[in-house]
Amino acid sequence: VVGLDLETTGFDSRSERIVEYALVGSDSDGSHIGLCSLVDPGRRIPPDSTAVHGITNEDVRGSGEFSEHTDAFSKIVEGAIVVGHNVIGFDWGFVHMEYLRAGLEVPKVRGFIDTLKLARKLRIPGRHRLGDLCDRYSIDLERAHRADADASASLILLWKFMNEYPERFRKPLDGIIETLD
């Protein structure tokens, strides 16, 4: 199980690019997974995007385009259950496009657990933005909109959901993944 989050130059995966990614969690033997890197998008980062995540053109200079990160990225996500907030609707679309741009096969994951979809399915009261849910569940998100902080928060949020609604999680992870589809 690995948490994934991205920061990008904008919202459209067809025209915008990744500027930071994080993969956090543990593998099947319980050892820690932690990979976080800035990425040179090969274009200028718009000021309105920098205003959200704080990542500047100077920050990413020399970080390598995403195609230079795919080996390490693939090694972690291949066959993994990927957890993230809006990971299906946003993050994985960017990952998919970056692999296509690089002429590479997109890694095959075991499945996704999207904490945004899960919050809606569980009918959690209030807004379902990651920051709002973290406030509700007392999850520290001081560095919101940085990939490592958001990926970690998504994993903790999943754990909080599992503790609050144990009856909804009394099945193998594959069953949980299927109910979110």
Question: What do these predicted ranges mean?
Answer:
Residues V1-G111, R123-H145:
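Conserved non-catalytic scaffold segment of RNase H-like nuclease domains
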Residues G93, L116, S152:
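Active-site phosphate/pyrophosphate-handling residues
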Residues I113-K121:
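Short, flexible loop segments at boundaries between secondary-structure elements
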Residues R146-W159:
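Acidic, divalent-metal-coordinating active-site segment for phosphoryl/phosphodiester hydrolysis
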Residues L157-D181:
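Acidic two-metal-ion nuclease catalytic site recognized across multiple nuclease folds
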